[in-house]
């Protein structure tokens, strides 16, 4: 195999609870992570040596600041791979949006180079390497629906719930740093009363809703502890959450560190209708109709391989 193309899917957080601080500087979390069909395309081409990264998005770096580039470097170093690669990223997942776009691209590079370079690594071995690059990348390697604990790298797969319709909304010119969001949460928690989180949904509630396939219960069980500090700084996030609910969403939540907000919709048709209506009211916001997906990374079939003699 000389080249391959992978679909790298975004994720949303159906649940994000911050349990405390860790000695390594990260936060101890409990999260439900869900792959969605919004995705980047990652093209990999073997080279004799070196790493070349090309991206069609002006805000995405094409050097070692990029997680996809660092994923290739890590595999070269750890597996003593002497080959190189050209990485081309076709971005559809917005940048700094709380959707793990950079993490998904890095996961695609790990999965793709494992095939392209013939490394023979297992999914578990790829996830162990991924954890050294970022907390979301181990999830993105496999995707689907998973419970994530630790700093997000300890994963427990849950039963997939494919095809649940979503409407995503992201302010076009707003990005939120994950590090800033966690710092803001700590400051917000320090200033809050001890009982402030008493009425929030709990992990057993969202797990039970997923197990029963109860969409209304799931919509009522959404939780993101990073949401309040981000809302305090960026009022548009709260306005979008409310707008999604008024447009028919069964439940709405900010994903990850934001600022993207998603609404769980009753159908793809309702999601498209809501998108068309909200576009007129929020011209500076980008909207996507998407849905739950059962996997994180897909290897596109080689068109040449599918051609009959």
From Swiss-Prot:
Q: Where does ATP bind?
A: 94-104
InterPro entries registered for this protein in UniProt:
GHMP_kinase_C_dom (IPR013750), GHMP_kinase_C_sf (IPR036554), GHMP_kinase_N_dom (IPR006204), IspE (IPR004424), Ribosomal_Su5_D2-typ_SF (IPR020568), Ribsml_uS5_D2-typ_fold_subgr (IPR014721)
Q: What molecular function terms (GO) are annotated for this protein?
A: 4-(cytidine 5'-diphospho)-2-C-methyl-D-erythritol kinase activity; ATP binding
Per UniProt, which keywords does this protein have?
ATP-binding, Isoprene biosynthesis, Kinase, Nucleotide-binding, Transferase
Q: Which residues form the active site?
A: 11, 136
- Identify the EC number(s): 2.7.1.148
BP-aspect Gene Ontology terms: isopentenyl diphosphate biosynthetic process, methylerythritol 4-phosphate pathway; terpenoid biosynthetic process
Q: Name one Pfam family in it.
A: GHMP_kinases_N
Going by the entry's taxonomy, the superkingdom of the source organism is recorded as Bacteria
Report which reactions are catalysed by this protein.
4-CDP-2-C-methyl-D-erythritol + ATP = 4-CDP-2-C-methyl-D-erythritol 2-phosphate + ADP + H(+)
Associated pathway: Isoprenoid biosynthesis; isopentenyl diphosphate biosynthesis via DXP pathway; isopentenyl diphosphate from 1-deoxy-D-xylulose 5-phosphate: step 3/6
- Disulfide linkage: none
Q: Which family does it belong to?
A: Belongs to the GHMP kinase family. IspE subfamily.
Q: What does this protein do?
A: Catalyzes the phosphorylation of the position 2 hydroxy group of 4-diphosphocytidyl-2C-methyl-D-erythritol.
NCBIfam families named among the record's database cross-references: ispE
PANTHER family linked to this entry: 4-DIPHOSPHOCYTIDYL-2-C-METHYL-D-ERYTHRITOL KINASE, CHLOROPLASTIC
Q: What is this protein called?
A: 4-diphosphocytidyl-2-C-methyl-D-erythritol kinase
Q: Name the source organism.
A: Synechococcus sp. (strain JA-3-3Ab) (Cyanobacteria bacterium Yellowstone A-Prime)
Q: What is the lineage of its organism?
A: Bacteria, Bacillati, Cyanobacteriota, Cyanophyceae, Synechococcales
What gene is behind this protein?
ispE
């Amino acid at each position: 195999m000389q080249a391959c193309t992978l679909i790298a899917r975004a994720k949303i957080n159906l649940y994000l609870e911050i349990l405390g601080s860790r000695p390594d500087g990260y936060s101890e979390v409990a999260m439900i992570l869900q792959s969605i069909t919004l995705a980047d395309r990652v093209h990999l081409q073997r080279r004799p040596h070196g790493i070349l990264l090309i991206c069609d998005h002006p805000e995405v770096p094409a050097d070692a600041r990029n997680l996809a580039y660092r994923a290739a470097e890590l595999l070269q170093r750890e597996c003593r791979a002497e080959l190189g690669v050209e990485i081309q990223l076709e971005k559809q997942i917005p940048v700094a949006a709380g959707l793990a776009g950079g993490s998904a691209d890095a996961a695609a590079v790990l999965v793709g180079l494992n095939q392209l370079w013939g490394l023979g690594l297992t999914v578990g071995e790829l996830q162990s390497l991924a954890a050294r690059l970022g907390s979301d990348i181990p999830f993105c390697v496999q995707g689907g629906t998973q419970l994530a604990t630790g700093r997000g790298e300890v994963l427990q797969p849950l039963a997939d719930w494919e095809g649940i319709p979503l409407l995503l909304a992201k302010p076009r010119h707003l990005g939120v740093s994950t590090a800033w969001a966690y710092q803001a949460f700590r400051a917000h928690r320090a200033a809050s009363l001890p009982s402030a989180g008493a009425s929030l949904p709990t992990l057993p509630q969202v797990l039970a809703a997923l197990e029963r396939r109860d969409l209304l219960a799931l919509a009522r069980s959404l939780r993101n502890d990073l949401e309040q500090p981000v809302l305090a700084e960026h009022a548009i996030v709260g306005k979008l959450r409310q707008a999604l609910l008024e447009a028919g969403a069964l439940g709405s939540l900010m994903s990850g560190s934001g600022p993207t907000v998603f609404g769980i919709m009753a159908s793809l048709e309702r999601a498209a209708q809501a998108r068309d209506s909200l576009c007129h009211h929020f011209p500076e916001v980008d909207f996507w109709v998407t849905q739950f997906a059962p996997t994180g990374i897909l290897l596109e079939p080689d068109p040449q391989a599918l051609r009959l003699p």
